[in-house]
Amino acid sequence: MKTIMALDEENYKELLALWELSVTATHDFLSKEDIQVYRELIGETYLQSLTLFGMRVNGKIVGFIGLKDQLIQMLFVHPNYMRMGLGKALVDFAIKEYNVTEVDVNEQNTQALKFYNNLGFEAFDRFEKDDAGKLYPILSLALINKS
């Protein structure tokens, strides 16, 4: 199993590049312009407000998770490493070590919804707009069944 390590500001550039690769592969509902807007927000604000952990392969970060209290704020895996258990390992780590119980997911991101449902999370709330005020509905999910 890959080792999960804490990440900090020295990793932000690499995390932003990984975020963009992952979002481009999984968030087909976002325009290129929106991706650029979110990239700036994440780089300037979001990363600094989160507790970050990641996994490396051959020295490169291939997956990371961002936590705030007991909420998963972001989870991204390099497209070449998706469906290999990295995301599950990061979520399991967050649940075990940080007692994570919730996650927010774009409603249009059906892959992520299925992923979290399979890990025991279920929707309990819905917001019409995301944190940036854009019309990308957000579903709040709570951990119902610890697997």
Model-predicted segments: where are they?
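A short beta-loop-alpha structural element at the N-terminal edge
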Residues: 2-17
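Conserved GNAT-fold acetyl-CoA-binding loop/helix
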Residues: 17-43
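Conserved beta-hairpin
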Residues: 51-63
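Conserved GNAT-family N-acetyltransferase fold
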Residues: 53, 65, 70, 75, ...
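A short, internal acetyl-CoA/4′-phosphopantetheine-binding micro-motif in the GNAT/acyltransferase core
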Residues: 71-82, 106
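Conserved acetyl-CoA-binding loop-helix of GNAT-fold acetyltransferases
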Residues: 83-96, 114, 118
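Conserved GNAT acetyl-CoA-binding A-motif
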Residues: 96-108
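Conserved catalytic-core motifs of GNAT/GCN5-like acyltransferases
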Residues: 104-106, 122-139
